[in-house]
Amino acid sequence: MDKNTETILKDYRYYLNVERGMSPNTVSAYCRDVASYLEESGEKPEKAGKEAMEKYLASRSGALSARSQARLMSALRSFFDWMILEGDRKDNPCDGIDSPKIGRHLPDVLSVDEIDAIMKSVDLSKPGGLRDRAILEILYGCGLRVSEACSLRISDVFPDEGFVRVIGKGDKQRLVPMGEMAKDAFTGYLSVRPMASTKKDGDIVFLNRSGARMSRISVFNMVRKQALLAGITKTISPHTFRHSFATHLVENGADLRVVQEMLGHESILTTEIYTHIDSKTWQAAVLKHHPRK
C-alpha cells in the first residue's frame, strides 16, 4: 500500500473516531475492511470503479455470511461517501450495488427462573464469587454491554442514589437505574475488592486476580461456567443478560423509549426487536386459550 493511500486511511480513521463518534471496535472493523479491499483489488481510492467493486464483492461473497457482507458494504460505502465529502471524489462506486438482505435475528433470552438459577450458582464464600455475582447482577440489572461492564469505574457507580453512569459506544454517556439486587451485589463485592486492586486500574470496578481489569473473554468464560453450574445448556453469553434485561422490561410494560435510553441505542428501530420477542409471549397465550387454536 503506497504512502498516499496510508495517509487517506489514517484520515478516514480520524473521521470515524472524532466526527462520527464510532466505537473503537467499529472503527477498526471499517478500516480493516477498506484496507483489505484496496489491497486485494489494487484500486486507488480516488479512481476505484463500480466494476472492480462488484468483482471484489463477488469474490468475497462465498467466504462471508450475509451479515458480514452487509458490514463490508457499509464500510466501503461510508469510506467513499467520506471521500466525496472531502472533495476527493465525485461519485461512490458502491451506488447501485445492493447489500445482502439480513433476516432479523431474535436474540436468545433467559427466563426469570433461569436468571435466578445462574445467580444462585455463584459461590459467595470467595472474593471471586462476590465479584462474579456483581458482574452478573449489573449485566442483567442495568443492561450493560460486556465492554461497558469491563470498563466500569467505581466513580461511575452511585449506589446510594441508585444509578450507574455508563460510557457507551462512541464515548456517549447515559444514566441507568440500579436496582436493589445490583446495589447489594456491588457493595458486597466492593468490601473485598481492595485486596486485588493495583494502582494502574485503581478505579476500575471488576478486577482479576492480578489486580488488572477483567477482559471480555474472562467475563464470557465466567458466564458460560455459571450457566452450566445452573444446569442451563442453551448457549449464552454476557450479551444474553442484556437481551434478557430489555425483554423482561418490555414484557412488563416498560415504555420502549425508556428501554432505548437505558440500552444506549441511537435508534428506536434497534430497540423494537424486543417487541418481537415479547410477541412470542402473547402469541403463545392466544394459541393456548383461543377456541379455534
Which ranges hold each PLM region?
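Conserved catalytic core of the tyrosine transesterase superfamily
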Residues: M1-K293
